[in-house]
Amino acid sequence: MKANHIRILLLVTIAIMFISLMGKWEQTFPADNTKQQTSATQNNSHYDNADSSTNTDVTITDAKSSLAKETNFSKYDNAKSITINTVVFKDVKVSLLDGAIISASLKDYSISLDDKTPMSLLTDKSGSEYIAKSTIVVNKQPISVNFEDQGIKIENSKQILTLTGSADGLQITRTYTFDDTKYNISVSQNIKNTTSAPVNVIVDDSFARDFDPAGDSFSLLNAHSYTFTGVAYSTAKDSFRKESFKDISKTNGQPTVINSDGQGWVAFLQHYFVSAWIPQSTNAKIYYKNLNGDVFEAGAFTGATIAPNQSENISSILYTGPIIKANLVDLAPNLEKTLDYGMLSFFSEIIFWVMNHIHSLVGNWGLAIILVTCLIKLIFYPLSAKSYRSMAKMRMLQPRIKRLQETYKDDRQALGKKMMELYKEEKVNPLSGCLPMLIQIPIFISLYWVLLESVELRQAPFIFWIHDLSMKDPYFVLPVLMGLSMFLQQKLSPAPADPMQAKVMMFLPVIFTFLFASFPSGLVLYWLTNNLISISQQWIITRHYQATHKK
């Protein structure tokens, strides 16, 4: 295959393959969960397996009925609630009905650039409810507990809310511990059996969310549509799995149950943010399902048999906040994997680590992107220089190549042979010009995911009109400049001998400009910076080579 064919193929690969393949990989080809998952048909109910001493069967209909009651959002409308504020949380509302957390806003993350109101990650807003709850289940039936507020105690930098309640012969004391500067909430409950018989109890820590999966559709020209919205979980056997809400909605309401085989966690995952329940027991079960069409539920339940006049302590950690690796890595094994940079995550993590350190020095993510690009070009300069020297040599050989094409225009086989002899004689590799593009492909894809998934770059400004590097350029200035830089770079490269190839190459800057118009402006900034540095390097090397090799 000719060098220009390969160059065109590489350019198209960068522009199209990574968009259509990388952007949709996890959604189009989800991991096979069948080995570790058990459907509701096999287990009758996700409550059946919570405790090995419980053998009574529960029908699927009974399970659906109990779950539907748990996600009756309107029951919290008239219930009293306690409001807590911390350094990172605004208006965390804990309902006295069942102790559900029905609202939590994040002070450091506004809704948008225009609306500086703290975004509500958990919310009781009608039509978009998203709550975290801890339900007590007795003999496979969820019970409703009307808690009483025992006040908030402050210890060091922590606020401890205590609720007490009783139902079905159980006395329940639940505490919520808020660390002022952290997004994790410790939820601990002491359950005492005041009856004369043993009681099988389940604590079901779960999320319920009203979400329309039809609105979560993929668009080639919307980079943010490539992000994931759905359930994520981790067990001893499966370190990290995801299931989109769209796929869960196709399960006809049947819950999927996973045996954690040790400590695991379950989460609702969305762009930039995650809410996760982390049970502290080793016998928890994890489940997720679709309820009532657009309502989704996922949770982890822990079972215990409590003897008469005895009590059991069951604890969990609730995290609801931004996906920041430093916040997650110590909370639970593999929770940091919710920061998913895709198939090239190894390179993405290195790029982000370098960018983050540069940002700590310069204070601007746009400058950090430019400096990272300069650093990458410096690291790969020896390879690039070799490639540009080869391209300069190819450029000087163009007159001889044209003469060969005229001489052997009717004999393509002879032309190919003579061309190879010429390349061998002059010690030039016609494919070496493709090397810079080959190097860029993994870096481009890795940086793409860093810009798309790192919450640190959400609403991060650069200069002038670029107010958010994670969003497209509102005036398309950077994409146009990037297209012009590609056009200029082509002028420095050897012209394709084939007229058709030449026309295709001429149109590529236009195609790239159109595609990049919808990409995050930070990514376009990287590509523009990379092109400008490449142009400078190629121009200097080409002039030097021509000056020292004139015949």
From Swiss-Prot:
Q: Which domain of life is it from?
A: Bacteria
User: Key word Iron-sulfur present in the record?
Assistant: no
Q: How does it assemble?
A: Interacts with the Sec translocase complex via SecD. Specifically interacts with transmembrane segments of nascent integral membrane proteins during membrane integration.
Tell me one Pfam family matched here: YidC_periplas
Q: What is this protein called?
A: Membrane protein insertase YidC
GO BP, sorted A to Z: protein insertion into membrane; protein transport
Renumbered to this chain, region (Disordered) spans 33-55
List, alphabetically, the CDD domains matched. 5TM_YidC_Alb3, EcYidC-like_peri
Give the UniProt subcellular location, in the record's own words: Cell inner membrane
Q: Please give one Gene Ontology molecular function term for this protein.
A: membrane insertase activity
Cross-referenced HAMAP family: YidC_type1 (MF_01810)
Which membrane topology term applies here? Multi-pass membrane protein
- Can you name a GO cellular component term? plasma membrane
Q: Outline what the protein does.
A: Required for the insertion and/or proper folding and/or complex formation of integral membrane proteins into the membrane. Involved in integration of membrane proteins that insert both dependently and independently of the Sec translocase complex, as well as at least some lipoproteins. Aids folding of multispanning membrane proteins.
Family to which this protein belongs: Belongs to the OXA1/ALB3/YidC family. Type 1 subfamily.
